[in-house]
Amino acid sequence: MMIIVMLLLSYLIGAFPSGFVIGKLFFKKDIRQFGSGNTGATNSFRVLGRPAGFLVTFLDIFKGFITVFFPLWLQVHADGPISTFFTNGLIVGLFAILGHVYPVYLKFQGGKAVATSAGVVLGVNPILLLILAIIFFIVLKIFKYVSLASIVAAICCVIGSLIIQDYILLVVSFLVSIILIIRHRSNIARIFRGEEPKIKWM
């Protein structure tokens, strides 16, 4: 029972719509009505400006980061292979990612899970996140597309999990990569059409 409560709590925390709340609270804007219509960090930078964008990014990363430690903090004990699987920090973090993408508070229309996924990886393997961040910014510097950099970093996470032989991370990163590609399908189409906005600060 405690495992179910923990996973539900992780989902609900992940579902907290940082961009939407910051937009409404400080700018009286529904961020979903501007830019890409997304509630995540990238659209927050675009619509609300850099300070708000950084705040939303921090909050979204933090959501994923703290949920990784729920099994430890809540002292949830596993007594079998199934319960052991669902008390793994990565699996608990996955529920936060799903909450971010499909938030119950906003009729299941959320962000694209990049920052929250980064928070989960930060909690599990900071060195891997550092490597992925370097890859992200290299791709971003070259191509100027946040969406492309995010997808490449996610795929590299899958490859990295194979290299370090972390098979739960492999499962989670593969699922997240699929989610990211699906959530970025309109961005991918715009890139091929040459219509995807490029960043101007790098």
From Swiss-Prot:
Broad EC category: transferase
Leader peptide range in chain numbering: none
TM helices/strands, residue ranges: 2-22, 54-74, 85-105, 120-140, 141-161, 162-182
Catalytic reaction(s) noted: an acyl phosphate + sn-glycerol 3-phosphate = a 1-acyl-sn-glycero-3-phosphate + phosphate
One annotated Gene Ontology cellular component of this protein: plasma membrane
Membrane topology: Multi-pass membrane protein
Pathway: Lipid metabolism; phospholipid metabolism
Alphabetical GO biological process terms: phospholipid biosynthetic process
InterPro entries attached to this UniProt entry: G3P_acylTferase_PlsY (IPR003811)
Pfam families assigned to the protein according to its UniProt record, in alphabetical order: G3P_acyltransf (PF02660)
Entry keyword set: Cell membrane, Lipid biosynthesis, Lipid metabolism, Membrane, Phospholipid biosynthesis, Phospholipid metabolism, Transferase, Transmembrane, Transmembrane helix
Protein's cellular compartments: Cell membrane
GO MF entry, a single one: acyl-phosphate glycerol-3-phosphate acyltransferase activity
Catalytic activity, EC: 2.3.1.275
Description of how the protein assembles with itself and partners: Probably interacts with PlsX.
Role according to the record: Catalyzes the transfer of an acyl group from acyl-phosphate (acyl-PO(4)) to glycerol-3-phosphate (G3P) to form lysophosphatidic acid (LPA). This enzyme utilizes acyl-phosphate as fatty acyl donor, but not acyl-CoA or acyl-ACP.
Family: Belongs to the PlsY family.
Protein name, per record: Glycerol-3-phosphate acyltransferase
Organism, scientific name: Staphylococcus aureus (strain NCTC 8325 / PS 47)
